[in-house]
Swiss-Prot record:
Pfam families: Mqo. The lineage of its organism: Bacteria, Bacillati, Bacillota, Bacilli, Bacillales. Residues 490-509 are annotated as: Disordered. Its cofactor is FAD. Gene3D superfamilies: D-Amino Acid Oxidase, subunit A, domain 2, FAD/NAD(P)-binding domain. Transmembrane segments: none annotated. It comes from Geobacillus sp. (strain WCH70). This is Probable malate:quinone oxidoreductase. Its EC number is 1.1.5.4.
Length: 509
């Protein structure tokens, strides 16, 4: 064991989009604070933030039908859609601030304009989509959305999806041009480059093995240097656990009461990626369908144009897989290691009440490539098996906890901050909508953990995020002004992404 002991203001565990965002916010709000980052892998953004491990959708509820459920009376509830959209606007404002102040360059490397389309088939689903369109059209956040059930119009919007379609079943779509494709891996790497320039100490190949509270109120971390094998002790006044699927284990090690009675259930994702450049060129949108009855919200199928390494790609999915690992680079013992006496009852209750999810996962695990092609052909009738390959995406750990609404052992499909009562440590758990709402979620961390500084920080926060504390849905003029200015700064006004020679090449990694 090394004798090295250090003390610092802030330690961030995990070099993903969440730590990158929190570190960047803190460096703007309290530049004198000393920050250290510990990351188990050799570079930033290699787990859930990596562009191959998530869908790259700028989630703004423009096309994701699971954010607008139908109420028992048949009306559409758009409250969650408004919330998700406003949270994404916060992210865009912060990124625009960073670009405008030359803290980030070349925004087209991490965000591009891309139409977002919702697609449904069948009479009931068409009726639902029309009602959704009417409900959203009255809200300024969703202006510019179009609805069509005319096959000729749909051919213009999504030629690949309409090509070879012979079914007489009713079909309809909504389209909005203000959608985005976000490369969260590229953004994470850019933010960590920025933090390095700001003097943040970033330690790769360093694994946090234990976290405990010391008698003087600091947090003591036992950190293993994976290159040398030595173990170091690092102390901090504040610790943020942003380790993706690895956060639950570290939260449990901290021993805070707020981390008790929480379990995790890992789900892995698979996508199909097109290896035929001619097919890739026929599609230019993110097209989201409707989850099948009984399927969980994370199973919504979508056909996405993506830009990875500045190259245009086409992906379809997700398909679910199962691995007991909590991280793609984790251990097969992760799930078992997370089971404690305090969360055993919660996990058992969840196992009994979530048969539909378990059945769905078993069915997904049994899918052959040809069965997956059949699902793809519901979107792309002309899809040929030889044009598509399967890639394994990231691991997601769904939170399981006891809630008033859902009772014991309820699976939470969102993102959640768990923090100590005194605000000295916080962990981020959960999955969707994840990275798109990173700035909003990290502002929540600041509010929970640094309430004594919020008044003094507020003017700077409002400079970075002009809509801070304001509902954009209720302030259409402010929304329009900020929507236009962020689009200008981030280069989102192009109808078609800037076409370079390299974009015509197909990538498949």
């Amino acid at each position: 064991m090394s004798n090295r002991q250090t003390s610092t203001d802030v330690i961030l565990i995990g070099a993903g989009i969440m730590s990158a965002t929190l570190g960047t916010l803190l460096k703007e709000l309290a530049p004198e604070w000393e920050i250290k980052v510990f990351e188990k892998l050799g570079k930033p953004g290699e787990e859930s933030s990596n562009e191959w491990n998530n869908a790259g959708t700028g989630h703004a509820a423009l096309c994701e039908l699971n954010y607008t459920p139908e109420k028992p009376d048949g009306s559409i509830d758009i409250s969650k859609a408004i919330r998700i959209n406003e949270q994404f606007q916060v992210s865009k404002q912060f990124w625009a601030y960073l670009v405008k102040n030359n803290l980030l360059q070349n925004p087209q490397e991490f965000i591009r304009p891309l139409p977002h389309i919702s697609l449904v088939q069948g009479e009931n689903n068409v009726r639902f989509l029309k009602k959704r369109f009417e409900a959203l059209s009255n809200n300024p956040l969703f202006q510019g959305m179009e609805f069509s059930d005319d096959p000729e119009k749909l051919k213009e919007w999504m030629p690949l999806i309409m090509e070879g379609r012979t079914s007489n079943e009713p079909i309809a779509a909504t389209k909005i041009d203000s959608g985005t494709d976000v490369n969260f891996g590229a953004l994470t790497r850019m933010l960590f480059d920025h933090l390095k320039r700001k003097g943040v100490e970033i330690n790769y190949k360093h694994s946090v093995k234990d976290i405990k509270r010391t008698s003087d109120g600091l947090w003591e971390l036992k950190v293993k240097d994976l290159n040398s094998g030595s173990v170091e002790i690092h102390k901090a006044k504040f610790v943020f656990i942003g380790a993706g699927g690895g956060s639950l284990h570290l939260l449990q090690k901290s021993g805070i009461p707020e981390g008790k009675h929480i379990g995790g259930f890992p789900v892995s994702g698979l996508f199909m990626v097109c290896n035929n450049p001619k097919v890739v060129e026929k599609h230019h949108a993110k097209v989201y369908g409707k989850a099948k009855i009984g399927a969980p919200p994370m199973s919504v199928p979508h056909l996405d144009t993506r830009y990875i390494d500045n190259k245009k790609m086409l992906l379809f999915g997700p398909f679910a897989g199962f691995s007991p690992k909590f991280l793609k680079n984790g251990s097969n013992m992760d799930l078992f290691a997370s089971v404690k006496l305090h969360n055993l009852g919660t996990l058992l209750a969840s196992a009994f009440k979530n048969f539909s999810l378990e059945k769905y996962l078993i069915q997904q695990l049994m899918l052959t490539k040809e069965k997956r092609m059949e699902e793809l052909r519901e979107f792309v009738p002309t899809a040929k098996s030889e044009d598509w390959d399967i890639v394994i995406a990231g691991q997601r750990v769904q939170i399981i906890k006891d809630t008033e609404a859902g009772g014991k052992g309820t699976i939470q499909f969102g993102t959640e901050v768990v923090s100590a009562a005194d605000g000295s440590i916080a962990a981020l758990l959960g999955a969707s909508p994840g990275a798109s709402t990173a700035v909003h979620v990290m502002l929540e961390v600041l509010k929970k953990c640094f309430p004594q500084h919020m008044k003094e920080w507020e003017p700077k926060i409002k400079e970075m995020i002009p809509s801070y504390g304001v509902s954009l849905a209720k302030n259409p003029d402010l929304f329009q002004k900020l929507h236009d200015s962020t689009a200008e700064t981030l280069g989102l006004n192009e109808k078609e992404p800037v076409s370079g020679a390299s974009e015509k090449e197909l990538v498949y990694s």
